[in-house]
Amino acid sequence: MPQQTITTNNRKSINRGKDIAKDTILTPNFYTTDFEAMEKMDLSINEEELEAICEEFRKDYNRHHFVRNKEFEGAADKLDPETRELFVDFLEGSCTSEFSGFLLYKELSKRIKDKNPLLAECFAHMARDEARHAGFLNKSMNDFGLQLDLGFLTANKDYTYFAPRAIFYATYISEKIGYWRYIAIFRHLEKNPGGKIFPLFNFFENWCQDENRHGDFFDALMKAQPRTVKSLSHKFEIFGYTFKHPIFDYYHRFRYFLNNHPIVSKLWSRFFLLAVFATMYIRDLGTKKDFYGALGLNAREYDQFVINKTNETSARVFPVVLNVYDESFYKRLDKIVENGTLLSAIDKRNNSNLIKVISKLPIFISNGYQLIRLYLLKPLESNDFQPSIR
């Protein structure tokens, strides 16, 4: 799809074609889930903790935090063209990611409010936070004469379906990794103010607390497992067709039995931790490396710190976590990053698409091999890894 850029009053509304044309596994995605299953969730096992977290959400600690000050005036004009481009790219990706969270949480709060009001209220509060973050980022984009077309994104972005259980795993890790990313940048710039290229970073300390509270919510929600659905269904859906028969009840019972088996939980924990960690590492050391350099950060050291801390935090809720301390862990991720450079070089050649695909095939196989070896790396049992916090 060609790039469509609309210019109004010297401001450009971006992403009317860019996001759809350039979607990759590394770009922020939009998600949907099984709303019927979500509204049937039984929270009684951990309702007290969920109610306490909801009360924290109601207090809205950052209600008056995201207020722009005079530091933003003229700050965009002080950046050199290269740093400006890197920072705008960061703003665009971050805003899209926050807006993606808003859409998911908002839709969940609307769909389940009648049958699961506590869960709906928690999602509504988180949607409020994500919308606030996205709006604040979009205002910073305005400083550069740009504005993300959020309405167009809502209508035209492809939505990826995840089952509720997968949403819990992936979103918990994403929220916790967001906390460690923001607090690490804030603390670095606090010690090295020369790297503070824009006043937006002054807000990261309080900002990361929103991410942390969101992660705590999903922690509590997962502790309300394993019996999340109050009643099973006689329906079976495939390829858009719905079949109804009591026999499908046994299928669902077997499926939920498998999903709730401890071994399955361990496999899912490893899968989602690796998926999130690998995606961030490949992106940051590939296309985002220069941005972190502009902040005075070493992208590799920064990512490894964030991954290690998120892995430790995840031991509070997941039965196992990744052995990121094994010497092969980051070596294999680095190999995938190197392969990414080779793939980019192949794309720049003046060869036919067929030749490019053939040239890339061994690299894709190498990436797959590295990821499989990482997944099969013996995990750390959370009870042994961090007994003090469990």
From Swiss-Prot:
Pathway: Porphyrin-containing compound metabolism; chlorophyll biosynthesis (light-independent)
Reactions catalysed, as given in the entry: Mg-protoporphyrin IX 13-monomethyl ester + 3 NADPH + 3 O2 + 2 H(+) = 3,8-divinyl protochlorophyllide a + 3 NADP(+) + 5 H2O
Gene Ontology MF: a single term: magnesium-protoporphyrin IX monomethyl ester (oxidative) cyclase activity
Pfam families on file: Rubrerythrin
Keyword Plastid (UniProt): no
One example of a Gene Ontology biological process annotation: light-independent chlorophyll biosynthetic process
Enzyme Commission no: 1.14.13.81
PANTHER family to which the protein is assigned, alphabetical: MAGNESIUM-PROTOPORPHYRIN IX MONOMETHYL ESTER [OXIDATIVE] CYCLASE, CHLOROPLASTIC
Function comment: Catalyzes the formation of the isocyclic ring in chlorophyll biosynthesis. Mediates the cyclase reaction, which results in the formation of divinylprotochlorophyllide (Pchlide) characteristic of all chlorophylls from magnesium-protoporphyrin IX 13-monomethyl ester (MgPMME).
Family from the record: Belongs to the AcsF family.
Official protein name in the record: Magnesium-protoporphyrin IX monomethyl ester [oxidative] cyclase
UniProt source species: Prochlorococcus marinus (strain MIT 9515)
